[in-house]
From Swiss-Prot:
It comes from the Bacteria. It comes from Pseudomonas fluorescens (strain SBW25). GO terms for cellular component: cytosolic large ribosomal subunit. This is Large ribosomal subunit protein uL11. The gene is rplK. NCBIfam families: L11_bact. PROSITE patterns: RIBOSOMAL_L11 (PS00359). Belongs to the universal ribosomal protein uL11 family. The lineage of its organism: Bacteria, Pseudomonadati, Pseudomonadota, Gammaproteobacteria, Pseudomonadales. One or more lysine residues are methylated.
Length: 143
């Protein structure tokens, strides 16, 4: 018989840097999950990623307090800020442009995000990422 699911927890945790402090500890603790077990498993799974990049994770908690988790790719906004060398996007994206990204950079980000995007092909994925860049106040070259 399948285990009964009691909760889904969505968090963004820095890759290879999960620890029991907030936000991880309180979110898992209120559902009775072994926090250190999650931290060790998450850090092991994200070892290949660049340390410190925010990584979305969806944790499924079962009635016996066991859990499974699925990691997603880093948010496009974080990758775009990194590609453009920025710390934040524009406060007024339609009027104030804060940086520029090229098609090559967009293709690299689209390859990273491809598993999480619903785009039919790579060109559609690049256009999706380009739309995110424009909404952050970045100029897009070559698209």
């Amino acid at each position: 018989m399948a285990k009964k699911i009691t909760a889904y927890i969505k968090l963004q945790v820095k890759a290879a840097q999960a620890n029991p402090s907030p936000p991880v500890g309180p979110a898992l603790g209120q559902h009775g999950v072994n926090i250190m077990e999650f931290c060790k498993a998450f850090n092991a799974r994200t070892q290949g990623l660049e340390p410190g990049l925010p990584t979305p994770v969806i944790i499924t908690v079962y009635s016996d307090r066991s859990f499974t988790f699925e990691t997603k790719s880093t948010p496009a906004s974080v990758l775009l800020k990194k590609a453009a060398g920025l710390t934040s996007g524009s406060a007024r994206p339609n009027t104030v442009k804060v940086g520029t990204v090229t098609r090559a950079q967009l293709e690299e980000i689209a390859k990273t995000k491809n598993a999480d995007l619903t785009a039919a092909d790579m060109d559609a994925a690049v256009r999706t990422i380009a739309g995110s860049a424009r909404s952050m106040g970045l100029n897009v070259e070559g698209v």
